[in-house]
C-alpha cells in the first residue's frame, strides 16, 4: 500500500457523495456536518429511536459516537447498528472517553458485543479500555499509558473482528494482519474540539466508497492529516480559530495529488 494507491479514494468520495448517518455528540454536531460537507459527503444527524433504523438502512455508512452519553442515545445506537448490519451498511464506532467512568466503559464494551463493526476508532486509552486492557485516561483524552499502541490495535482488531484505528501523534490502522502507520497531521488539531470525532465520520465517508476498510481508513487518515498540515501552514501563527476555518477549506480543497505528494505512510 502506498500514497498513489490510496490517493484516489478521496476522488471516489467526491464523485459518489455518500450519505453518512451520524449518531454523534452535541459538542461536535455542527463541526462534523460542515466537515463532511466540505469533503464532499452528505451528512445526516438522525437520533430518534423511531427513525434511526430506517435511516441507517439507506446510508452509505453509520457512525456511532458516544461523546455525550444518554440512555436514549445508546438505545438509538443499538437500533441503528443492528439495522445497518442487516442491510450491509458499514458501522464505525468512536468510544469517546471509554475508561473515564464505569457507565461509559460499560457502553463502550456493550456496543461492539451487539453490533458488527467495520471500524473502531479512538485514542490508545479508549481502545485499550474497550478490550479491558489497562491504560491511563484523563477525561476523554489519552493518558500517558505505557502499552504498545500497535499491539493494542492488533488485539482490538482480533478480539472485535474489525479494523482498529488508533490515533495520536502517529496513527495506526490494522485488521490484525495488515498494519499501517500514518505520520501526517499537526498538533494544533488538539486545540479544536471535535477533530477526532469529525475524523471518525470522515473515515465513514471513505468506508462508504471503498470496501477494503484498511485501505479506506489509511486513505482517510492521510487525507485528514495532509489537510491539517496545509491548513496549519497558513494559519498556525494566528491561532486555533483561524485554523478551524482554514481546515474546513482544506477538507474541500485537498486533492488526491496532495495526498500522493505529502502523505507519509509505512506498512509495518
From Swiss-Prot:
Give the domain of life. Bacteria
Q: Name one Pfam family in it.
A: HK
Q: Which residues bind substrate?
A: 45, 194
Q: Cite the InterPro entries for this sequence.
A: Hyethyz_kinase (IPR000417), Ribokinase-like (IPR029056)
Q: Name one GO molecular function term.
A: ATP binding
Q: In which pathway does it act?
A: Cofactor biosynthesis; thiamine diphosphate biosynthesis; 4-methyl-5-(2-phosphoethyl)-thiazole from 5-(2-hydroxyethyl)-4-methylthiazole: step 1/1
List its EC numbers.
Answer: 2.7.1.50
For activity, the cofactor(s) needed are: Mg(2+)
Query: What are the protein's UniProt keywords?
Result: ATP-binding, Kinase, Magnesium, Metal-binding, Nucleotide-binding, Thiamine biosynthesis, Transferase
Q: Which residues bind ATP?
A: 121, 167
Q: Which reaction equation describes what this protein catalyses?
A: 5-(2-hydroxyethyl)-4-methylthiazole + ATP = 4-methyl-5-(2-phosphooxyethyl)-thiazole + ADP + H(+)
This protein's record includes keyword Signal: no
Q: Which Gene3D superfamilies does this chain map to?
A: 3.40.1190.20
Signal peptide feature range: none
Q: Which family is annotated?
A: Belongs to the Thz kinase family.
**UniProt function note:** Catalyzes the phosphorylation of the hydroxyl group of 4-methyl-5-beta-hydroxyethylthiazole (THZ).
Protein's name according to its UniProt entry? Hydroxyethylthiazole kinase
- The source organism is Bacillus anthracis
Amino acid at each position: 500500500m502506498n500514497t498513489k494507491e490510496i490517493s484516489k479514494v478521496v476522488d471516489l468520495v467526491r464523485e459518489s457523495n455518500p450519505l453518512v448517518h451520524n449518531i454523534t455528540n452535541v459538542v461536535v454536531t455542527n463541526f462534523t456536518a460542515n466537515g463532511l460537507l466540505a469533503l464532499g459527503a452528505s451528512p445526516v444527524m438522525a437520533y430518534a429511536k423511531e427513525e434511526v433504523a430506517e435511516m441507517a438502512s439507506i446510508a452509505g455508512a453509520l457512525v456511532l459516537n458516544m461523546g455525550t452519553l444518554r440512555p436514549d442515545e445508546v438505545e438509538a445506537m443499538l437500533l441503528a447498528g443492528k439495522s445497518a448490519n442487516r442491510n450491509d451498511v458499514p458501522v464505525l464506532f468512536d468510544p469517546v472517553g471509554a475508561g473515564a467512568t464505569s457507565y461509559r466503559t460499560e457502553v463502550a464494551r456493550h456496543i461492539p458485543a451487539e453490533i458488527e463493526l467495520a471500524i473502531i476508532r479512538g485514542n490508545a486509552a479508549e481502545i485499550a479500555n474497550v478490550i479491558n486492557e489497562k491504560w491511563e485516561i484523563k477525561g476523554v483524552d489519552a493518558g500517558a499509558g505505557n502499552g504498545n499502541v500497535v499491539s493494542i490495535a492488533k488485539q482490538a482488531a482480533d478480539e472485535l473482528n474489525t479494523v482498529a484505528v488508533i490515533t495520536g501523534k502517529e496513527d495506526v490502522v490494522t485488521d490484525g494482519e495488515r498494519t499501517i502507520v500514518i505520520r501526517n497531521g499537526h498538533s494544533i488539531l488538539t486545540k479544536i474540539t471535535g477533530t477526532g470525532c469529525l475524523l471518525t465520520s470522515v473515515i465513514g465517508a471513505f468506508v462508504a466508497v471503498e470496501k477494503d476498510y484498511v485501505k479506506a481508513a489509511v486513505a482517510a487518515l492521510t487525507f485528514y492529516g495532509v489537510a491539517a498540515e496545509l491548513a496549519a501552514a497558513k494559519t498556525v501563527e494566528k491561532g486555533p480559530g483561524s485554523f478551524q476555518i482554514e481546515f474546513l477549506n482544506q477538507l474541500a480543497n485537498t486533492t488526491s495529488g496532495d495526498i500522493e505528494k505529502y502523505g507519509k505512510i509505512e506498512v509495518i
